[in-house]
């Protein structure tokens, strides 16, 4: 009996080592669309879910339990003749070592997502062409999710995924669709990718690694050491802000991390709290108004 079980596990091993990378929850919110057959929105949700979760996106060896938890929420603003105008909220999380806590990595809203989709139309993957703007947008954010996740585990670990995202952006620029072009918007897909690959903001990727591996992951063993590393990362964030105050990385960090930092420093010495607050309020003036209101 034991030999049979072992044989079964050996047969299963190749499939476990080549598991898909993502466990993505997809939602398509059509509440703003009236007088339309809602079935197309459910079909779209199912198609996107299968497209993301059933695909192997890289050569990385990831077991089923290591799949990255993420979500994509498409809010449909307009729908006419198979043309969708949407906002897309992308979120991803990763577990913190030696704890049950998960930390947010991405919490990003794309306000310019438009695509054509006919019900039951297959979503076709391609690395070398734009099959549809929908799959191009999905591909881009999948690669960004993978890049940011791998950056949090190893220094510059996400580079291969940013290179793939760069290919998608280059292809997207040749289309007439919004969101792909430089200088079109400071928070579009082109701006998001550029922030991760430009030399001027390279320090962000290092602080991202320090914050997670040296900071959060360390706190289960030593709260003080882990928190000190997070404080160092915040000081690095200030340098990124000074070099590129309009970078999309600044609101990206805020949307993912500010609530978490309240808990990180809840039991820190007063002097440490004040120092961190002073640094962050210089980057995010909204904190000053929040403090005054409190």
Question: Can you say where each PLM-predicted feature lies in the sequence?
Answer:
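Sec-exported extracytoplasmic/periplasmic mature domains
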Residues: 49, 53-57, 147-151, 262, ...
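N-terminal targeting/trafficking signals and adjacent low-complexity tails
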Residues: 243-273, 277
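Bacterial Sec-dependent N-terminal signal peptides
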Residues: 1-22
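Flexible, glycine-rich surface segments
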Residues: 158-246, 250
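Acidic/His-rich structured neighborhood in mature extracellular/periplasmic domains
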Residues: 82-191
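Conserved small/polar residues in nucleotide/adenosyl-binding loops
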Residues: 289-294
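Start-of-domain marker
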Residues: 21-82
């Amino acid at each position: 009996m034991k030999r049979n079980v072992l044989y079964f596990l050996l047969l299963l091993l190749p499939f476990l080592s080549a598991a898909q990378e993502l466990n993505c929850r997809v939602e398509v919110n059509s509440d703003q669309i009236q007088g339309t057959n809602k079935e197309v929105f459910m079909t779209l949700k199912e198609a996107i879910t299968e497209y993301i979760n059933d695909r192997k996106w890289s050569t990385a060896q990831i077991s089923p339990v290591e799949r990255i938890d993420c979500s994509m929420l498409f809010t449909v603003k307009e729908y006419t003749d198979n043309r969708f105008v949407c906002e897309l909220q992308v979120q991803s999380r990763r577990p913190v070592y030696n704890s049950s806590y998960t930390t947010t990595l991405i919490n990003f809203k794309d306000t310019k997502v438009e695509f054509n989709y006919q019900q039951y139309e297959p979503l076709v993957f391609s690395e070398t062409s734009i099959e549809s703007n929908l799959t191009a947008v999905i591909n881009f954010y999948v690669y960004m999710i993978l890049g940011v996740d791998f950056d949090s585990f190893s220094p510059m670990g996400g580079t291969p995924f940013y290179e793939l995202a760069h290919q998608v952006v280059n292809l997207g620029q040749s289309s007439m669709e919004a969101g792909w072009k430089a200088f079109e918007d400071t928070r579009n897909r082109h701006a998001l990718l550029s922030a991760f690959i430009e030399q001027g903001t390279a320090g962000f990727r290092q602080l991202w690694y320090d914050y997670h591996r040296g900071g959060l992951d360390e706190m289960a063993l030593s709260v003080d050491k882990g928190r000190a590393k997070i404080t160092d990362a915040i000081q690095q964030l200030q340098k990124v802000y000074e070099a590129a105050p309009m970078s999309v990385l600044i609101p990206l960090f805020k949307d993912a991390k500010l609530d978490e930092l309240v808990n990180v420093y809840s039991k820190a010495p007063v002097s440490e709290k004040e120092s961190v607050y002073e640094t962050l309020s210089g980057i995010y003036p909204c904190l000053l108004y929040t403090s005054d209101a409190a």
